[in-house]
């Protein structure tokens, strides 16, 4: 009994699949391997291009035999020696006539034939439950219901299977109540067996139609269907076959002809007989072949559990199942492409790198389209509503993954773009600095356009037509905004560098100008700060006025330079205002540092000494003083000292001579601009009188020397001045020789004769007069010391030369050299004038290296 088929519960083999499969066994168990069978027979991939036929009839009436001859199947047939049930349950096999004897051109593709267990069998007896359930199953799944009937049974009720047909009609109404919208039709194909030809086929047809109409009229119809006709739900077709035993050749011939009717047909109206094949489009249950097994299993589950069979619901459930299954299948391909990209991004994120994946947009869009199209190809055959929902879910699932991938890509492009922009601007600025000039605003504008184009290109490459979230305009605006922020930061840094350069320039100018002003302290009498061209020097009391005016002029020029250069950066007025405010503050601090440098203890003492010496050692015309005992050294010293001491209070505080008050520093610096940020104040030193909260007043800010330093400076200066005074006094007194008066009397008495002799001799008198005048001049000019040193050196040199000459004489005389055992003279013992010291002695020899 179909032992060569793949039965329920078995682990079927490919060879068993070649014959067919048991769909439902006699115990009402469904075969879950049906989908494998459809795959093995290549029906599953046919989509809607398949047809399902079921055969009904009484037991042992030759249903399986009929199918085997029509479709070349191998269903088991009853043994003629023992009339008993052969087909148990429902069996299925694929049409095998296709492709043989040229029949492939006349029969439809992928015809599946179900051999249903016969009715009215003694094995089941009164139990008609399986009969009803199998009829409902066949009607819910099949396009064509073949009713196998013998000619002599026509006109009978039980013999002609009228009871079975009534069951078919009843379950059809049951199905229709659940599916009024589609109103699926079915074909009842009556195959009249053992037709001998005495009764024309047309008469037999009329008899059957009358019987069917009568049965339909006796049915209890649902509300609203009372006037319905059988033709509203069923089409009828009729065929007759000769007796198989009595006319075997004729039977085979007619069976072959009948098989050709199982092809696609058509008709122009419902009331017209269809022409061509028996498979009309309205018969198809619109269940894709790859979902047929799931659909059939769901239908049978509802039937066997005595639940109301709701085909639309079953179709929806099938659609949900298959769409989910197809979605998982296509998502595997999606993962195979996307997961490696996600792993690359995850690795880059872990390493903290901004990695832009190449061709991500093309890959993502192509993979998405491929997956959606694959889903559409397979799933669009199912329930449209379910398909639409599941497609939306698939697209949402794909888009969620792609969105995360794309956003990470844009984030990486964002970061790398910002970094590239910053580096490009920085490098261009450095190159411009080396070249000697650059326009910061042009550099920023050029690099910004280039970077925006890069990001725009990357964002556009990720665009998917019809997908709203791939319109990355917000991300583009955010990127542009951050570039503006980076531009502002770079501009601020550039302005900081500009400020530093201007500050250096200010410090350099202040270093020269302020140093010159301090060098002018008391320099009107030929000191270190005396004017070169003899113009009248500036007064000491307006020192701070000159310093403030010089400082103000330098700052005005610096502000002009800063503002002009900042405008070329396209800096805002607020940024320029903040920069100028910082410049004024830092410039004032630089001035204070320069003043403190000039007012260091060693420097100020030197300035005071120079000031004092300028007044003490030089007269009003700048001529050096030669101190004589008759000079008023004490008076000059006192005036010079008091004048210099008067500088200390002047230098102690920064005050203008005109107002005798500090300069208006708060007005000069100005209030803090509204655009100043906390970081703009971090490197600024507090200024007294400006930053009141720092607790330092303007008076304290303008104090250069504290009271203790002033007192210490006065004491040290007085000690230094006293030393200069003592030195001057000593030089004046040191020129006087105290000779006793009696010495001149004794000299006159004892030297009278010599005096008379000199006076009487004009030549001697003139010589004495010249020598005396020369000595007086030498004494007056303090040249006696140097002259004595020169004379001493000359005498010493003469002695050395004499010794050398004597040595030469002894060395040249062989007899004398032998007598005193004198060694020969070396070649380098000569005496040169440059070998003698200031006293005429021979200087110590310094050996020289012959290699130099």
Swiss-Prot record:
Keywords: Coiled coil, Endoplasmic reticulum, GTP-binding, Hydrolase, Membrane, Nucleotide-binding, Transmembrane, Transmembrane helix. The keyword tRNA processing does not apply. Residues 47-283 form the GB1/RHD3-type G domain. One of its GO terms (molecular function) is GTP binding. Residues 834-845 have a biased composition (Basic and acidic residues). GO terms for cellular component: endoplasmic reticulum membrane. The keyword Transmembrane applies. InterPro entries: G_GB1_RHD3_dom, P-loop_NTPase, RHD3/Sey1, Sey1/RHD3-like_3HB. Pfam families: RHD3_GTPase, Sey1_3HB. GO terms for biological process: endoplasmic reticulum membrane fusion. GTP binds at residues 57-64. It comes from the Eukaryota. Residues 475-500 form a coiled coil. Residues 760-762 are lumenal. It is a multi-pass membrane protein. This is Protein SEY1.
